[in-house]
Amino acid sequence: MADTTVEKLATEVGKSVERLIEQFSQAGIKKGQADNVTEAEKQQLLDYLKKQHGGENAPTKMTLQRKTVSTLSVAGNGGQSKDVKVEVRKTRTFVKRDANEATLKAEEEAKVEAEALAKAKAEAEAAAAVKAKAEADAKAKADAEAKAKAKAAAEVKVVKDMSPEAEAARLEAERLKAAQEAATKRKQDEEAAKAAETARLLAEEHSKRWAEEERQRLEAEKNGDHHITTSKVARAAEDTSDLDEEKRGRRARNKSNAKKRGGKDARDGREKHMRNRSTAPESMAHGFNKPVAAVSRDVRIGETVTVSELAHLMAVKATEIIKQMMKMGSMVTINQVLDQETAQMVAEEMGHKVVLIRENELEHQVLKDRDDEDGIKQESRAPVVTIMGHVDHGKTSLLDYIRRAKVAAGEAGGITQHIGAYHVETENGMITFLDTPGHAAFTAMRARGAKATDIVVLVVAADDGVMPQTIEAIQHAKAGNVPLIVAVNKMDKPEADIDRVKSELSQHGVMSEDWGGDNMFAFVSAKTGEGVDELLEGILLQAEVLELKAVRDGMAAGVVIESQLDKGRGPVATILVQEGTLRQGDIVLCGLEYGKIRAMKDENGRSITEAGPSIPVEILGLSGVPSAGDEATVVRDERKAREVALYRQGKFRDVKLARQQKSKLENMFANMTEGEVKELNIVLKADVQGSLEAITDSLTGLSTDEVKVNIIARGVGALTETDATLAAASNAILVGFNVRADAQARKTIDSESVDLRYYSVIYNLIDEVRAAMTGMLSPEFKQQIIGLAEVRDVFKSPKLGAIAGCMVTEGTIKRSAPIRVLRDNVVIYEGELESLRRFKDDVAEVRNGMECGIGVKNYNDVRVGDQIEVFETVEIARTL
């Protein structure tokens, strides 16, 4: 880029040439009117102008405002003093010089010092030069004197006849001349000595100052006291200075007032001054030292703790715990819930002491505060007998005959859908029966029945023998270590085979007493009543052997057999009392729920006020529907019962969340590799909790890799409008098991066209859901060969190209069907049959053994000996 002259630049910027030259001169650049200006000189001038007008390089300013409020006592009218608030405001501006300015300043100082050194050196050199000149002059003078003496001697020789007066005048002149020369030399020597001394003093002064500055710099670097320039200390020093100044002014005012008022006020002023005396300023050195040893803490860990909470307890970052758990082979997040054992392992691995605490201390105290001391007398109680067996083997019919009541007719399809609890008075004593379902879906309900029972009666049909649920009942009885009595039912049938039943049971470890075993066998008929009395006697005999006893007086405890949500009565729970006496008005803590018993009913629906051990009873008044199998306990304080229930709910939620999180992490790769899976959404409502669990397990078990049953909502009670809305939004099937939809729900179902299904037998529900899943399966297609033709000759057609003259060897050849051309039994082309003729006539199909002409669409390379294979795609129905 060409350089610009000063005159041209002045025209561009709109200034006079003289003003621009002046600004160049101020910026340190000497220019004339016709001189060229480079880009670097332009930038230098621009930087100078910016600095002059407060631009980028202008010094940075910071203004601090300080406001101090103090109180001044002023004498008022009547000799009373009053306090006056005095506010002092100060503004200070600090200027921060930029690096360029500091550099320039340092350069100027260095330049001044260099000039001083040069000046001292020049003076020393001048003094040395003066001295050398004086010495040279003295030497020249001596030489001149020697020459003069020699000349004088010669003159004496020549002029011997000179008069004495002339000689005296000559000597006087020589003496004056010598004195003058000596004075001049002495003056020169004094000046040279003075200059040398001045140079020496100046050099000593500069060397001392330089040495002192170097010593201060080294000392500052050694101490490293960089805090002196920090704003915090500067503000503290400024505040201290302001306070000192204010106190000096206040002291002066107090002294003047004390002189005016007298002794007491003066003393008060001195005391006040002593109280207000400021403390010594704190040290600027920090007081924190890095710990050199590992810190071991006592970490108190509850039953569950999150990663962030554990990090807070150990005073470390959560990332440290996550790293430690990754080293231990576990992937966690900061909000993940850890169980007590895992948290203990992590804390001990990181060097801390662990103190395990029980968060359920309140629960322990509430359950301990009961009237069940060891000194209370225990009395004999009735045995709790659970009737088990395969479906349709006659369990409910047998119980029906014993109770003399028609229970089986009330069950849908004659199949027991949930546990029935009944107590029966016999001539020899009372027996409580639990009738469990025999269907495969009710495994959990049978397990609960075996857990709460004393004796298991295994019903086996004499004509059917041992079945899958029979084997399962045997396993439940053995797992619960419960005595087993076998009731061989349907003895009135001619197909009854006792030996077969005994033989099959013996294969599963159930040996009759006749065969040397320990199990009692009773051969009964629920239809005729044959052997029922012997069965009851055997049950009571077994109960006597067990010596069943329980506390009758005191606070009751039991187990939830069944629970449901009744529309009119609210949550209803069937409880089997195991000890104590349950009374109306008691406070019951039942699993995650609690409440005060508002009403009690027996198995026949009659209201009762109390129930003793081994008595099943329905209670009303709980806060929610408890889960079947929960322990029910009577407590004293409803408020504490509520606290325990809320604690249990929170704990249940934490455990569930931890389990879900673990499942998510473990199934991460499985979920990633899963393809597109179709889902059958279901909203399920049932009459009782046990049936709901059984149906849920059965439907979930139907899921396959292609179709998944997704129960998006389930509950106990009637179908409500909320259920219908959820089903409509989720495109789900609404299923009711022994429940119906209310009026509002029916309106929503009709308006949203929701698929609603009612069931009363679990068989039908499972079969229809399986059929629906089968319809959701992706169709499977299969290629089926319908005909095969052999090429005997090839003709050329102007319209269709190559025409193959063929003989149909197998099946039927159809027009417009997909074909394959085979050569040496290898597929070389796959396409469509375009033309099919027989004797110049277009035909739809040609059967086996006939000749025809075949035109293959978009293919002309047909040769003699090729085979043309005709096939069709057939859809195959799939099943689960």
From Swiss-Prot:
Q: Where is the composition biased (Basic residues)?
A: 249-262
Ligand binding (GTP): 389-396, 435-439, 489-492
Residue ranges of region G2? 414-418
tr-type G domain spans which residues? 380-549
Annotated spans, G4: 489-492
Work out whether the entry's keyword set contains Plastid. Answer: no
Q: What is the protein name stated in its UniProt record?
A: Translation initiation factor IF-2
Alphabetical UniProt keywords: Cytoplasm, GTP-binding, Initiation factor, Nucleotide-binding, Protein biosynthesis
Q: What is the purpose of this protein?
A: One of the essential components for the initiation of protein synthesis. Protects formylmethionyl-tRNA from spontaneous hydrolysis and promotes its binding to the 30S ribosomal subunits. Also involved in the hydrolysis of GTP during the formation of the 70S ribosomal complex.
Instruction: Return the similarity comment.
Output: Belongs to the TRAFAC class translation factor GTPase superfamily. Classic translation factor GTPase family. IF-2 subfamily.
Q: A Gene Ontology CC term for this entry?
A: cytosol
- Composition bias (Basic and acidic residues) maps to 180-194, 202-228
The subcellular location is: Cytoplasm
Q: Which GO terms describe its molecular function?
A: GTP binding; GTPase activity; guanosine tetraphosphate binding; translation initiation factor activity
PANTHER family recorded for this chain?
TR-TYPE G DOMAIN-CONTAINING PROTEIN, TRANSLATION INITIATION FACTOR IF-2-RELATED
Spans annotated as G5: 525-527
Q: Which gene encodes it?
A: infB
Chain residue ranges for the region called G3: 435-438
Q: Does the keyword Methyltransferase apply?
A: no
Q: Where is this region: G1?
A: 389-396
Instruction: Specify where the region named Disordered lies, as residue ranges.
Output: 180-289
InterPro entries assigned: DNA-bd_dom_put_sf, EF-G-like_DII, EFTu-like_2, IF2_assoc_dom_bac, IF2_II, IF2_N, P-loop_NTPase, Small_GTP-bd
